């Protein structure tokens, strides 16, 4: 019998269309695994997003993707439908018929005529009653009075989809009608209530999956949640889903087929990895934006550096950052600054900027590898025993051992923690005026820094997020306890690790949100900085021309040569070091301007003895006029920017990173934060976090990279 991919099911060919009895070129599947890793990570993410948005998920047993699982889990049945491959029906029926035939012939099979686990020495001929008892004793979970101990409905939907996919392959001995019933529950958005805890994911996710079986068999303690959030009894759930014929009386092996699988752990892992892949790309793009607003040197993305390191994740991360920075208006402006007094500045940027490709690259490789591992798992047959109709036998093994889930989730969580650590280091530099190349302390955007502490609370929150994230990076899989009378003496803890990784993803989203809003604040501050610097230069130039050019009798004055050096002072001084009180004698602007005039006076020689040619005599007049004019001009420039009419437009509009800024500022309507407003940072973070959780950030993120050709810039 052929499945939806044209491959014959159950014992005749494997999932890649190869005869099990035939010698193949890739018998160990290493080639298939390697082939799955070809192409760029970004292209893979784009493909995931496209699959996620398709309205139909067609199940045939062997082609399910993590993005399809994420779509079913997240969209609650609205806009996406599950369809079963009719071609799989015959294979499923064949294995179900084989179980009944073998039972009638007196064949001794685990879980069909025997007890379970460490008590498999017991025997019975009451196959149906045995399955009923299996579901009863596995209903050992605790829900309590609220939802704290209930598996999230999204994860339950993911588990239902994955379990259907596994059972469709026809090695499990279950009726097709049961799979159709679960599909109806999914399509009608009716979700069984599963306990959050209680599984060690070997022998499969027995306890939580038994509650799906409990709903199918009408157990009185089973419950479901309907489309509107109303709690449903089994009778109500069946009626609402349109499942006819009443509750199922499980035949031999069917209960075991339902519960003895890794679907809960791998389903949640699929959800986690869909988000983790997107967050990894976001971290790459935000690292590039960080370089822009920090006036970083783009040399750190040079392809030769990364080519010589050989790691593909690093090479791609650097190429993505290089693409964002190539032609960036910020990079062009920063280059001019770096050329000014180069020997007095650090030769290279700090590690959080300069080594971000080297840091992120391995994390992307880990996340990508984990994605492929989980994708193999959700397309695997993972129960026991396996029914091989072609050889007329039940094979007793251990595919229920969810080690790929536990290991991949531990690794993913460590990668997520590393991404968060980099993000925290970058954010810490961004808000610190000792490191951020002229941005104000705490990214304070108001006029009075004594009454505006900007992102100080956000930095404290980021430290909290990062600390918890680093704690979560600790592995789960080394905490295995021997279970079930020492029969399950090693077990994967797959769902526990998936749950912890889900928590880690949520924290990374909190950090990504905070950092992204901080970057947008920095972009706006650079815009303000540019407008204010232009205003200060124009004002200093105007006053210099008026005061320093001519003498009292209209003759040219020696001080006319000071203007160029005065403007150089403005160029060299950080605007936010003095702009709250630009004419203060304790701030660097007035001090350096006076110092410049004094130096010119000292070089003026004998002219200083003459009042009409003395530069020193001009200093007080210059300062007085500047004090009278500059504060007004600065306030006027601020007001113009706040009203949307700045003299100089925002550089971000000329950059490839603009779509993310536009999304945060214009589409979500977040504000430039200052102590002069009532709006708190958390209110703005909330807008971005909710949008990020809904996946709304995906399109602007990918728009930043839509013109990237998938390769580094050529080395010429």
UniProtKB/Swiss-Prot annotation:
Active site positions, chain numbering: 110 (proton donor/acceptor)
Sites where the protein binds (E)-cinnamate: 260, 348, 354, 384, 456, 484, 487
Keyword Zinc appears in the UniProt entry: no
Covalent cross-link 5-imidazolinone (Ala-Gly), where: 202-204
Modification after translation: Contains an active site 4-methylidene-imidazol-5-one (MIO), which is formed autocatalytically by cyclization and dehydration of residues Ala-Ser-Gly.
GO MF entries: amino acid binding; phenylalanine ammonia-lyase activity
The protein's Enzyme Commission number: 4.3.1.24
Subcellular location: Cytoplasm
Disulfide bridge map: none
2,3-didehydroalanine (Ser), modified sites: 203
Keyword Lyase: yes
CDD domains xref list: PAL-HAL
Record pathway: Phenylpropanoid metabolism; trans-cinnamate biosynthesis; trans-cinnamate from L-phenylalanine: step 1/1
Matching Pfam families: Lyase_aromatic (PF00221)
General function of this protein: This is a key enzyme of plant metabolism catalyzing the first reaction in the biosynthesis from L-phenylalanine of a wide variety of natural products based on the phenylpropane skeleton.
Complex and partners: Homotetramer.
Protein's recorded name: Phenylalanine ammonia-lyase 1
């Amino acid at each position: 019998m052929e499945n939806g991919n044209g491959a014959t099911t159950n014992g005749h060919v494997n999932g890649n269309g190869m005869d099990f009895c035939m010698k193949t070129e890739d018998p160990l599947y290493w080639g298939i695994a390697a082939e799955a890793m070809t192409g760029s990570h970004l292209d893979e993410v784009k493909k995931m997003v496209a699959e996620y948005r398709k309205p139909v998920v067609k199940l045939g047993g062997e082609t399910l993707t993590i993005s399809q699982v994420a779509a079913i889990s997240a969209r609650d049945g609205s806009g996406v439908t599950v369809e079963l491959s009719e071609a799989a029906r015959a294979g499923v029926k064949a294995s179900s018929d084989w179980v009944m035939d073998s039972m009638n012939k007196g064949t001794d099979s685990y879980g069909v005529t025997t007890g379970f686990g460490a008590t498999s020495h017991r025997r019975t001929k009451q196959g149906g009653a045995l399955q009923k008892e299996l579901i009863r004793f596995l209903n050992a979970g605790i829900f309590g009075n609220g939802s704290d101990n209930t598996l999230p409905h999204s994860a339950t939907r993911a588990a239902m989809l994955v379990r259907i996919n596994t059972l469709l392959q026809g090695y499990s001995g279950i009726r097709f009608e049961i799979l159709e019933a679960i599909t109806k529950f999914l399509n009608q958005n009716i979700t069984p209530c599963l306990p959050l805890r209680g599984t060690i994911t070997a022998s499969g996710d027995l306890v939580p999956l038994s509650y799906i079986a409990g709903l199918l068999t009408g157990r009185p303690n089973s419950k479901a949640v309907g489309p509107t959030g109303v709690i449903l009894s089994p009778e109500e759930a069946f009626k609402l889903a349109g499942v006819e014929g009443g509750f199922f009386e499980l035949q031999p092996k069917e209960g075991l087929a339902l519960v003895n699988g890794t679907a809960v752990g791998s389903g949640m892992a699929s959800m986690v990895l869909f988000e983790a892949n997107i967050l990894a790309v976001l971290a790459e793009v935000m690292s590039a934006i960080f370089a822009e607003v920090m006036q970083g040197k783009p040399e750190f993305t040079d392809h030769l550096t990364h080519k010589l390191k050989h790691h593909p994740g690093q090479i791609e991360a650097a190429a993505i950052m290089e693409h964002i920075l190539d032609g960036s208006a910020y990079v062009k402006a920063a280059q001019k600054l770096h050329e000014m007094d180069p020997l007095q500045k650090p030769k290279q940027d700090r590690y959080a900027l300069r080594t971000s490709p080297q840091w992120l690259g391995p994390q992307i490789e880990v996340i990508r590898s984990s994605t492929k591992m989980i994708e193999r798992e959700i397309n695997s047959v993972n129960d026991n025993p396996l029914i091989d109709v072609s050889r007329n036998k039940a094979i007793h093994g251990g595919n229920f051992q969810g080690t790929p889930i536990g290991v991949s989730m531990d690794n993913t969580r460590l990668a997520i923690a590393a991404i968060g650590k980099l993000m925290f280091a970058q954010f810490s530099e961004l808000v610190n005026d000792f490191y951020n190349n002229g941005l104000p302390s705490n990214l304070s955007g108001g006029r009075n820094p004594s009454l505006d502490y900007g992102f100080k609370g956000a930095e404290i929150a980021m430290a909290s997020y990062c600390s918890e994230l680093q704690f979560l990076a600790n592995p789960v899989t080394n905490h295995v306890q021997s279970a079930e009378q020492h029969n399950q003496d090693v077990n994967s803890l797959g769902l526990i690790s998936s749950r912890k990784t889900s928590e880690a993803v949520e924290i990374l989203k909190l950090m990504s949100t905070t950092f992204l809003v901080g970057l947008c604040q920095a972009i706006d501050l650079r815009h303000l900085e540019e407008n204010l610097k232009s205003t200060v230069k124009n004002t200093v130039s105007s006053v210099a021309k008026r005061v320093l050019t001519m003498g009292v009798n209209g003759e040219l004055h020696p001080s006319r040569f000071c203007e160029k050096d005065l403007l150089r002072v403005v160029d060299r001084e950080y605007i936010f070091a003095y702009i709250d009180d630009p004419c203060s004698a304790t701030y660097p602007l007035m001090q350096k301007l006076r110092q410049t005039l004094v130096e010119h006076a000292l070089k003026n020689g004998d002219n200083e003895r003459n009042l009409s040619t003395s530069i020193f005599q001009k200093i007080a007049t210059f300062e007085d006029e500047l004090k009278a004019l500059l504060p007004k001009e600065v306030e006027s420039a601020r007001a113009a920017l706040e009203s949307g009419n700045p003299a100089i437009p925002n550089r971000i509009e000329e950059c490839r990173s603009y779509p993310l800024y536009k999304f945060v500022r214009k589409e979500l309507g977040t504000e430039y934060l200052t102590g002069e407003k009532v709006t708190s940072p958390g209110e703005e973070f909330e807008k971005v976090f909710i949008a990020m959780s809904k996946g709304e950030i995906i399109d602007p993120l990918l728009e930043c990279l839509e013109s990237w050709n998938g390769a580094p810039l050529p080395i010429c």
